[in-house]
């Protein structure tokens, strides 16, 4: 699709530590299942887009198995901190690439069309393209052309940090707004939003998207909201 030589990094936490904000509504097994299914969906979209070489950055053996199953390259993650891990991966790879795409593995609705559009938006050099979360606070997808354009500053309020760094450097900053890329699965409410958008038809998530489970999640989120408002 693209004349650019692109590296794609998909960072993944250890599955036992994933989605801890949902611990009050989903048990450990359900959280692992949620992460594995959404990760496979993200990797499938990336493979269908055919925009570059895909690398999973992780330390979990089960994630490595997914990489093997889908013929995706695997980079062992040597640390627990996201930004240093990504910097190490970029340092190992990106001297051989024209651009870098970072996609998180908890985007159940992302499509190959979304990925192609983001790359197309960032085709001029230098440029940074961000797909923010639905709160316009975090960053779910980041495209850098060239790969070393900006330091990684993922974490709370990363959207504003990337924007500010682009402004300081005089770099083109572009935003891709899409329901598909905005919905990440960090909070119990995100499960309810996914069910509202897609019903109960995501293969592998039938148990989590069961109406009974959704009712329990809705009750917990309502109680949490009431406590915050009290």
From Swiss-Prot:
Key words, A-Z: GTP-binding, Nucleotide-binding, Nucleotidyltransferase, Transferase
Protein name, as recorded: Phosphoenolpyruvate guanylyltransferase
Additional information: The exact nature of the substrate is currently not known. This entry has been annotated based on its similarity to Actinobacteria.
A molecular function GO annotation: GTP binding
Similarity comment: family membership: Belongs to the CofC family.
Enzyme Commission code(s) on record: 2.7.7.105
GO terms for biological process, alphabetical: F420-0 metabolic process
Broad EC category: transferase
Stored InterPro entries: CofC, Nucleotide-diphossugar_trans
Pathway: Cofactor biosynthesis; coenzyme F420 biosynthesis
Source species: Thermobaculum terrenum (strain ATCC BAA-798 / CCMEE 7001 / YNP1)
Residues annotated to bind phosphoenolpyruvate: 139, 155, 158
Function statement: Guanylyltransferase that catalyzes the activation of phosphoenolpyruvate (PEP) as enolpyruvoyl-2-diphospho-5'-guanosine, via the condensation of PEP with GTP. It is involved in the biosynthesis of coenzyme F420, a hydride carrier cofactor.
Reaction catalysed by this enzyme: phosphoenolpyruvate + GTP + H(+) = enolpyruvoyl-2-diphospho-5'-guanosine + diphosphate
